[in-house]
From Swiss-Prot:
Low complexity bias (residue ranges): 60-84
Cys-rich GLG1 repeats: 116-149, 150-212, 215-278, 286-346, 347-413, 414-473, 475-537, 538-604, 609-668, 670-728, 729-788, 796-856, 858-911, 912-979, 980-1035, 1041-1101
Subcellular location: Golgi apparatus membrane; Golgi outpost; Cytoplasm, Cytoskeleton, Microtubule organizing center
Segments in the Extracellular topological domain: 30-1145
Name of the molecule in the record: Golgi apparatus protein 1
Gene from which the chain derives: GLG1
Length: 1179
């Protein structure tokens, strides 16, 4: 190829090639050309000249349609005189063209179709109207590829000689100067080239994209096809790649062993060797640098017309007709069309392979794509994406330029729409076929073979690898994971979901239904899809593809274009971030976003907050990440071991995070901190829990819409949900989610945002080193109670903390699981006695109270303590407050929380009282009467009386054991004796009155007389409304009672009723009218009204009501009997019994005799003590 001369600079074709290209500008569209030709020109005007230059064309023909200069005419005359038509020669040495000889036949120029070696092939293959046109015949023959139309070896050799001669005549440059005259003038670089060396034509080819002159551009493009049919005709290519062809075994370099015009296979082989080298970490065979440049330059020069890539042209000719029939050739349009159909089922494998090779070359050098290089030329220059500035290897050139331009777009710079369109196409191309990314091939080869074999189309391999990274199919190496992350950044599918074909196809139906209000290609489409994750509108395949992509987007905040646009200023200011296409080895995955969300929830006092727009985006991302722990890089990284250890069976949506929260105390420190911080964040903005919000949407809309609409949550929404957890509209999923969050809050007081903000200073001061919320609540509550009881001038707990503390206390009463100590103590009892009872609404606690006598000792003690607390502060009695909610509003709207139960008891017998509430009040009264400690008012009023009169009972009682009403019974007896203090007497009177109406309020009576009540008073006990009939029944049947303890209790009742008529409801009802008439002026209490009635009964002038008179007589008879059989309670009772006894004389005689005998013994036996002298006594 020495005839081509020296190449002046790298990547240029020979001057002879460019002479031919420019010369061809004078030719018109050749007859017989296919429907996809480049265009039309002056046609046969140059046919004679081509024949002449080619070594056989006729002489003496002019070029009528070119502007004829005197120089051009002189050149033509010289050629006519010196040259005669000559037949084609056999292959000649590299030193120069074949010898010319005359003999052209009369009357016409030399015709390729008339040559003996090609005549048969031309007649068989080419249409008849092309035979007179050498260029048409040449194009026809070199485009033949079908086996049945194989061209003979002699004809191939003739064609090659013909083309070679066309490329080696130095006189073509002068013709090119005429054809491209105006173009050369416009392109200064080409006008300055020296004349006669072929450099000017080489320059024109370099600037082919800038040629606007139609004639010049069309013919350069047209005639290039001749050269690209054989690598040996491309000047310099043979010299640069000779050794590589041999090493790679790309075919013979000696003519004759292959079809001369089909040597494009050699270029294809070299291209494959080049891309294969990039895909191997330690390639066995390396393409030389000179040949690499030559290969890429040839690919670049063939980038506008697929006819110029001979291998691809022949491999894809049928596919072009099938898929791109209406696509006009030129400017790379056919390439792009074929790329778009690359994964069609009907695409031939050989064409798909050729297209893939072409795409891999584009990945190595963006200029191999004509459309991309042309559309983005000005933008690349504008944003300094120059190749010379590349910090990375040549293999990354396309990806680097894409990222450079994407960075400009993300910074809000203007990039032309044409360039952005091209970028979109090539980003989609990289996502569709993993093999176009050498880094993926290098880093993920093993993973692809092991996990993703057979998934090579439409981006399925990349999504398969993404699935592996998510941990669904195994483990992925760090190098592969990093390569995937880099590819995702290069393709930037977050900016336009259509880039990810697998995602696009899987989610098309969801987008059409759920996201149809968002324009196609908008970045918010992905966000919309995330919002509909795990909803009825989401399909399974879309769900998987979406989460696989989001896994990588979540690890680089820059890959969410909306977040980046709204937060890049804040990130730069607060988190010291780099540019979009810059990375830092010192900044771990997710670090920027972690920084952003830490600042997002800062208060104004803490300073350095995010802008409102950025905060909204951070919240959006947090809401989306809550869907899946794998979307939180830090969480998955730090908690990988714990997830496997504790949560391997938790596979449903959202269960993994809940599992980690449930095992918070068991997690390793780093994981515990991450989960704790996330939970603390959720407490401030529960909307981060997107799944919970979705489940609770009806409740939020009906009851919490006011707080839900607030941009700043601050824990209000969760508080509202807790308050409305038992509404009829509440669904099971929402209730479970809210309860779970409450349970998690118990683990650390920081997890209750409002509580933390209100009480953090108090906790530091009063409860240091306490972490669990329940312990903090107990600590603060105890402090508040002590200050209240001691009537401290100033509370140690601040007012705002006391208010929030009350909210927390009330919330904890709703579910036994919210009181961990009680729950742990009673777990076995719950299983034994309350297994059929559901949690929530304090139902388990109520069940334990009802089975209190059967509980284990530890649980019984805890329940008793709980009841003691509830009685001191009835507002903490969840069941009472729930059942009596409306009655409290009706009867006790102004009542203090401490006196709430007292108020309800006072209104218990009102006609307006709700039966269910009345029943609940009675239950609490029964509880109170079992132990004086459960009645705070009695305890306070009788503080001095209890130790004085009931000391023996207190001494025998064990700590934390119930007294079963013994102390209250003791006080009742003292009440009858009128020995109690006035405050205590008032409280005991109320208890006696209440228990007289309902026997269940007297625990001692119920304990000792249960059998008698069942046998003697079953009908009265079964009555729904207790009005004292059971007590009356027992009094009437006193003589039938055999059990001494029961008889004693009934006698005590009689004794109590004698002390005051109010404690005998039956008598009081019967004598109510008489009391009004005869005893109205008598002050109640201390038996005064009873004495009044007795006097009225004895006074014959007073006529009492018959029922009252009958009841009074019955009572006198009962009291008389009681006086006889009742045991003496003290010395006075004993003396009275002796004096009223029928055997009092006998008793007194025995007592007197005993005294006399004792006296006589003293007289007879003398003194007992030893006698001593007076001196000793006086000393």
């Amino acid at each position: 190829m020495a005839a081509c001369g020296r190449v002046r600079r790298m990547f240029r074709l020979s001057a002879a090639l460019h002479l031919l290209l420019l010369f061809a500008a004078g030719a018109e569209k050749l007859p017989g050309q296919g429907v996809h030709s480049q265009g039309q020109g002056p046609g046969a005007n140059f046919v004679s000249f081509v024949g002449q230059a080619g070594g056989g064309g006729p002489a003496g023909q002019q070029l009528p349609q070119l502007p004829q200069s005197s120089q051009l005419q002189q050149q033509q005359q010289q050629q006519q005189q010196q040259q005669q038509p000559q037949p084609p020669q056999p292959p000649f040495p590299a030193g120069g063209p074949p010898a010319r000889r005359g003999g052209a036949g009369a009357g016409g120029g030399w015709k390729l179709a008339e040559e003996e070696s090609c005549r048969e092939d031309v007649t068989r293959v080419c249409p008849k109207h092309t035979w007179s046109n050498n260029l048409a015949v040449l194009e026809c023959l070199q485009d033949v590829r079908e086996p049945e139309n194989e061209i003979s070896s002699d004809c191939n050799h003739l064609l090659w000689n013909y083309k070679l001669n066309l490329t080696t005549d130095p006189k073509f440059e002068s013709v090119a100067r005429e054809v491209c005259k105006s173009t050369i003038t416009e392109i200064k670089e080409c006008a300055d080239e020296p004349v006669g060396k072929g450099y000017m034509v080489s320059c024109l080819v370099d600037h082919r994209g800038n040629i606007t002159e139609y004639q010049c551009h069309q013919y350069i493009t047209k005639m290039t096809a001749i050269i690209f049919s054989d690598y040996r005709l491309i000047c310099g290519f043979m010299d640069d790649c000779k050794n590589d062809i041999n090493i790679l075994k790309c075919g013979s370099i000696r003519l004759g062993e292959k079809d001369a015009h089909s040597q494009g296979e050699v270029v294809s082989c070299l291209e494959k060797g080049l891309v294969k080298e990039a895909e191997e970490r330690e390639p066995k065979i390396q393409v030389s640098e000179l040949c690499k440049k030559a290969i890429l330059r040839v690919a670049e020069l063939s980038s506008d017309d697929f006819h110029l890539d001979r291998h691809l042209y022949f491999a894809c000719r049928d596919d072009r007709e099938r898929f791109c029939e209406n696509t006009q050739a030129g400017e790379g349009r056919v390439y792009k069309c074929l790329f778009n159909h690359k994964f069609e089922e009907s695409m031939s494998e050989k064409c798909r392979e050729a297209l893939t090779t072409r795409q891999k070359l584009i990945a190595q050098d963006y200029k191999v794509s004509y459309s991309l290089a042309k559309s983005c030329k000005s933008d690349l220059k504008k944003y300094r994406c120059n190749v010379e500035n590349l910090p990375r290897s040549r293999e990354a050139r396309l990806s680097y330029l894409l990222m450079c331009l994407e960075s400009a777009v993300h910074r809000g710079r203007q990039v032309s729409s044409e360039c952005q369109g091209e970028m979109l196409d090539y980003r989609r191309m990289l996502m569709e076929d993993f093999s176009l990314s050498p880094e993926i091939i290098l880093s993920c080869r093993g993973e692809i073979e092991h996990h993703c074999s057979g998934l090579h189309r439409k981006g399925r391999t990349l999504h398969c690898l993404m699935k592996v990274v998510r941990g669904e199919k195994g483990n992925l190496g760090m190098n592969c994971q990093q390569a995937l992350q880099t590819l995702i950044q290069e393709t930037d599918p977050g900016a336009d979901y259509r880039i990810d074909r697998a995602l696009n196809e899987a989610c098309e139906s969801v987008i059409q239904t759920a996201c149809k209000h968002i324009r196609s290609g908008d970045p918010m489409i992905l966000s919309c899809l995330m919002e509909h994750l795990y909803t009825e509108k989401m399909v399974e395949d879309c769900e998987h593809r979406l989460l696989e992509l989001q896994y990588f987007i979540s690890r680089d905040w820059k890959l969410d274009p909306v977040l980046y646009r709204k937060c890049q200023g804040d990130a730069s200011r607060l988190c010291h971030t780099h540019g979009w296409n810059e990375t830092s080895e010192f900044m771990p995955q997710g670090a920027v976003f972690s920084c952003l969300y830490r600042h997002a929830y800062r208060t104004e006092e803490q300073g350095r907050r995010l802008s409102r727009e950025c905060r909204a985006e951070v919240q959006r991302i947090l809401h989306q990440r809550a869907m899946d722990v794998k979307l939180d890089p830090a969480l998955q990284d730090k908690c990988l071991i714990d997830l496997g250890k504790w949560c391997s069976e938790k596979t449903e949506t959202g269960q993994e995070l809940e599992c980690l929260q449930d095992h918070l105390d068991d997690l390793v420190v780093e994981c515990r901190d991450i989960v704790g911080n996330l939970t603390e964040l959720e407490s401030e903005d529960i909307q981060i829990e997107a799944l919970l919000m979705r489940a609770c949407e009806p409740i939020i809309q009906n009851f919490c819409h006011d707080v839900a609409d607030n941009q700043i949550d601050s824990g209000d929404l969760m508080e509202c949900l807790i308050q409305n957890k038992h509404q009829k509209d509440m669904n099971e999923k929402c209730a479970i989610g809210v309860t779970h969050f409450q349970l998690v809050q118990m683990k650390d007081f920081r997890f209750s945002y409002k509580f933390k903000m209100a009480c953090k200073e108090d906790v530091l001061k009063l409860c240091p080193n306490i972490k669990k919320k329940v312990d903090v609540v107990i600590c603060l509550s105890t402090t508040v109670r002590n200050d209240t009881l001691q009537e401290a001038k100033e509370h140690r707990v601040s007012l705002k903390c006391r208010r929030q503390l009350r909210v927390e206390e009330l919330e904890m009463t709703e579910d036994i699981r919210l009181e961990p100590d009680l729950y742990e103590a009673c777990k076995s009892d719950i299983k034994n006695f309350c297994s059929a009872v559901q949690y929530g609404n304090a139902q388990i606690i109520e069940c334990l109270k009802e089975n209190k006598k059967q509980l284990s000792t530890r649980c019984h003690q805890k329940v008793f303590k709980l009841q003691e607390t509830e009685m001191m502060d009835p507002e903490l009695d969840y069941t009472l407050m729930r059942v009596c909610k409306q009655m409290i509003k009706r009867f006790c709207p102004e009542a203090d929380s401490k006196t709430m139960l007292q108020c309800l008891k006072q209104n218990k017998n009102s006609e307006l009282m709700d039966p269910k509430c009345k029943q609940m009040i009675t239950k609490r009264q029964i509880t109170q009467n079992t132990d004086y400690r459960l009645n705070p008012m009695l305890r306070k009023a009788c503080k001095a009386d209890i130790p004085k009169f009931c000391h023996g009972i207190l001494t025998k009682a064990k700590d934390d054991s119930e007294l079963e009403g013994q102390v209250i019974s003791c006080l009742k007896l003292r009440y009858a004796d009128q020995r109690l203090s006035s405050d205590c007497e008032d409280q005991i009177r109320i208890i006696i009155q209440e228990s007289a109406l309902d026997y269940r309020l007297d625990p001692q009576l119920q304990l000792h007389c249960s059998d008698e009540i069942s046998s003697l008073c079953a009908e009265e006990a079964a009555a729904q409304e207790q009005t004292g009939q059971v007590e009356e029944c027992l009094k009437v049947n006193l003589l039938k009672i055999k059990t001494e303890l029961c008889k004693k209790e009934v006698l005590n009742m009689l004794k109590e009723s004698k002390a005051d008529i109010f404690v005998d409801p039956v008598l009081h009802t019967a004598c109510a009218l008489d009391i009004k008439h005869h005893c109205a002026a008598i002050t109640p209490g201390r038996g005064r009204q009873m004495s009044c009635l007795m006097e009225a009964l004895e006074d014959k002038r007073v006529r009492l009501q018959p029922e009252c008179k009958k009841r009074l007589n019955d009572r006198i008879e009962m009291w008389s009997y009681a006086a006889k059989v009742a045991p003496a309670d003290g010395f006075s009772d004993l003396a009275m019994q002796v004096m009223t006894s029928p055997s009092k004389n006998y008793i007194l005689s025995v007592i007197s005799g005993s005294i006399c005998i004792l006296f006589l013994i003293g007289l007879m036996c003398g003194r007992i003590t030893k006698r001593v002298t007076r001196e000793l006594k006086d000393r």
